[in-house]
Amino acid sequence: MFRLFPLLLTASVLSACGHGDGSGIPQNAALEPTLASIQANVFTPTCAITGCHGGVATQAALHLDPGFSYSNLVGVPSSQGPNLTRVVSGDPNNSLIIHKLEETTPPVGAQMPWGGPYLPQSTIDVIRQWIANGAPDS
C-alpha cells in the first residue's frame, strides 16, 4: 500500500491539472492586456486551481493565485530550466509562458493548461500584449 501512495498522489495531482481547460474563463469578459484582467479572467479560473498553480503545493513552483502572480512570473527563471525566464518584460517571444501556452512541445514540460483543451489564441494574444507592454503590475 505504501508503495502505491506516491503513484496515487501523482495521478491525482496530474488529473486535477487537466481541469485548466479555459472553461472557467467568463465568455463575455472583455479581456484587457493588464495583469488585473488576465488574473481575474485567465489565471484565477484556469491556472490557480488546487494541484496546478494555486493553493499551497504548486506545480513547477509557480503560484498564480491573486497577489502572487506578478512576483512569480516577471523576471523569474523557470524552475524547469534556469536559462528560461517565465515572463521577459517587453519580450513575449522569449517568455516561457507564451511557449507553454502556444506550443505543443515547449522547451520544457508540456503545453498548458496540462492535458488541454488549451486557451484560445485570442486569449494568448492578450497575454502577449501585456508582456509586450512591459508586463506592468496592474
Where are these regions (language model features)?
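Sec-dependent signal peptide recognition
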Residues: 1-10
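C-terminal motif of bacterial Sec signal peptides marking the signal peptidase cleavage site
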Residues: 13-16
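Solvent-exposed helix-loop boundary motif
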Residues: 19-31, 36-121, 125
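Flexible coil segments in periplasmic/lumen-exposed cytochrome c-class electron-transfer proteins
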Residues: 121, 133-138
